[in-house]
Amino acid sequence: MDEIRDFLRSRSVANLTVVIINVAVFLILSCFGDTENADFMAAHGASYTPYIVQDGKYYLLITSMFLHFGLSHLFNNMVVLIFMGDILEKKLGKIRYLLIYFGGGIAGNCLSVYMVIKV
């Protein structure tokens, strides 16, 4: 138990908060359906181009940043985020780290939407 407490205390606050939100969202969605089912995930905030472009649901560009299609997707992303995010937050500070996290996520989702429209 002490190892877990020490590990959590050594984490950067903003990054740890992002990780906790990602895991919490995954656990909540897992209680209600299959996180590997595209229809279920689209109904719960995944980035889906027709919803964004035709229906104007631009908030999906943000909500989708916290969704993971299955446990392995969540696990791999969180392992990288825990270690790389801590380094980045300690180097840049909380505000700049969060700007990069959200800016990168939104930009990536916009690029994905653009590529779907273009093809």
Describe the role of every protein-language-model region.
Residues 11-119:
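N-terminal TM1-TM2 helical hairpin plus the immediately adjacent luminal interfacial "cap"
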Residues 1-10:
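Cytosolic juxtamembrane amphipathic/interface segments immediately preceding
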